[in-house]
Amino acid sequence: MSDLQKRLQRFFNAHHIAVVGASAKNGWFANVLANAAWIGADTRFYPVNPGADEVCGVGACRSIAALPEGVIDFAAILVKEEQVLDVLAQLRSRGIVNVLLFSSGYGETGAAGREKQRAVEDYCRREGMLLMGPNCLGYMNFHARISMFLG
């Protein structure tokens, strides 16, 4: 199996998922949890929210730095577009290189958004990060019972 195949395997079969920007206010994280329960996912979620010790009944970390070391397979990003590059750098510094970017405000908004998207893509490429997104709904792996889907 090639290095890329191994990385994709870990990306699509993640069992320890950080959700940066998880909040009970907007309902997105609640959707993620509901979809994971529906598919019977064997997934542990680690919501990251600087203002909460718990999000939707799941114990939260107040920062990316507070995530358990060497455990996280994958990170989903639910923050505003202007925070994304900083979040990516923090994740990379923790060795988290598999990323799903839910955030919008990129190519779908026009030329300025395409430039912002290019900056995110360039950063991820340069840092060896696998990126799905931006502005996507996520994925479900029915075979492995993994759900990282907002819909």
Regions found by a protein language model. Give the residues of each.
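Catalytic-core regions of core metabolic enzymes
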Residues: 1-151
